[in-house]
Design a protein with these regions (language model features):
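Bacterial N-terminal signal peptides that target proteins for export
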Residues: 1-8
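Alpha-helical transmembrane segments
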Residues: 11-15
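C-terminal motif of bacterial Sec signal peptides marking the signal peptidase cleavage site
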Residues: 16-20
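Insoluble glucan recognition modules
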Residues: 22-82, 98-171
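Beta-propeller fold detector
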Residues: 92-97
């Protein structure tokens, strides 16, 4: 009886590793190739712009890009515009989400761009800033790899400060 238990334990010790190492036919996650997203192509309306306080509500810059087409089942593509000064990490700057309009554009007025230079990037009046921008296309489907457009460069000069002198000085 003592030897019988040894034979049973030996058979189990041999059978369990053999059974656990058998071929496992569980399916893997689908390959990312089945859903491919093309990178958008970004363009900017002006490469050099001097902002003007008299045109504060007019469009100063317009970013437009091509649609990032998806070769897959129904997945909607969302876009984010990233903007930062030259020499800094592009994705740590300003992020503006695309609103879902029919045309793939984001615009800045003279006032918006001037406020961005002064408040966000710490610029001074009359100072020229060189910027870089890109568009990041992504979907809600984790199997589709996100794509980023090539960077575009442009420069903007903030409003020159207006010096208002009083008509007369009072003492």
């Amino acid at each position: 009886m003592k030897h019988l238990w040894k034979y049973i334990a030996g058979a189990l010790a041999f059978a369990l590793p053999v059974a656990s190492c058998s071929d496992d036919n569980t399916s893997d996650f689908p390959d990312k190739e089945w859903g491919e997203l093309t990178a958008p192509v970004l363009t900017v309306s002006e490469e050099e712009i001097t902002l003007d306080a008299n045109k504060a509500d007019r469009e100063a810059l317009k970013f437009s890009w091509t649609a990032a087409s998806v070769v897959t089942r129904s997945s909607s593509v969302e876009y984010d515009l990233y903007l930062n000064i030259e020499g800094e990490d592009l994705f740590k700057g300003i992020k503006r989400e695309w609103g879902g309009e029919a045309d793939l554009t984001i615009s800045f007025t003279h006032e918006e761009l001037n406020d961005l230079i002064i408040t966000t990037f710490g610029g001074k009046s009359g100072e020229r800033f060189a910027f870089r921008a890109c568009v990041y296309a992504h979907t809600d489907n984790y199997l589709i790899e996100d794509k980023t457009s090539e960077e575009v460069a442009f420069a903007a000069t903030a409003y020159a400060a207006e010096v208002v002198k009083p008509a007369s000085l009072w003492m």
